[in-house]
Amino acid sequence: MFVASLKSRFLNVLKSLQNHFTPLKVVLLYHAVQAENTDNTFNNIAISLANFKDQIKHLKKHINIVSFEQLLQAKKDAVVLTFDDGYANNLLRVLPVVEAENVPITIFISSFFMDGKREFWWDELAFYVTQVSVQKNHSETEKREMYNSHSSKIMPLDQLEKASYIEELFLRENMQLPFREEFRPLSLQELKILCTHPLVTIGAHTHKHNRMALFGKEEQHQDVFDNIKWLEEISGSSPKLFAYPHGGKTAFNSISKSVVKELNFSHAFAAYSGRISANSDKFALPRIHVGNVKGEELI
């Protein structure tokens, strides 16, 4: 049974989902785990390694950490750990922790980025906004507005256009594109290690990480199809689990769900809070985003 904690929005979500007559089944959403709290993405998607270790230890004391396949059959409270995008720190920092604790994880890969040569565009944009804001003495509100303004313009673009947009921003300010160890995507060789690891399940996350609802069916289908074929070539097997990029309720639509069904995924995950039940939509399963907090603030 989870212990009440006023500090934790995460815990409040879990408590609101509990039902004394059925087991609590939830899926947690992570992205990057960094050596320290160096996240500047404006999206709160990175947590420190120390907090991640603490979270796993505390979770293990109170709930079973299982694979998604095991969650579907679970008779007791259970939780699944998922990671989106394909950050290199999923191998370098997360894997040693899950090996030590012997817990399974699922990583959803956006294949376009897996050459290890550039950061994800949202991290590049965050770096740009942070540096420019320091030079111009922007307030936190102004920084947020700048990031959101550029992000809204970038979202509808194709991936190559996204990259060009970012490059133009940096060129305009005579800045170099960053390539930071804590933010870089997996290399192909690193991904292959994860693909063969017994504690890791690899899922699909589109090829280009487009916000699917902004595109028509043909573009959505191609983006997911390319991701599947790329992952098949790298791993030797076809992914059965899918996660919608960005993941909120407006990030995908009925067309997105039909594409995922047509391409033979068994389940698809969103990024809004909720529990998994027999009545859950298999192609819009909820996940709870985990913040950069200590384990005791979770449970």
Residue locations for each model-derived region?
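Short, glycine/acidic-enriched loop or turn micro-motifs at the edges of active sites
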Residues: 87-88, 208
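Generic enzyme active-site microenvironment
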Residues: 82-83, 203
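Glycine-rich active-site/cofactor-binding loop and its immediate structural neighborhood
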Residues: 80-82, 99, 104
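Metal-dependent polysaccharide deacetylase catalytic core of the NodB/CE4 family, i.e.
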Residues: 34, 101-250, 284-285
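Aromatic-lined substrate-binding rim segments of carbohydrate-active enzymes
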Residues: 89, 97-99
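A metal-dependent hydrolase metal-coordination microenvironment
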Residues: 83-85, 125
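C-terminal active-site subregion of NodB/CE4 polysaccharide deacetylases
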Residues: 1-82, 89, 120, 196-197, ...
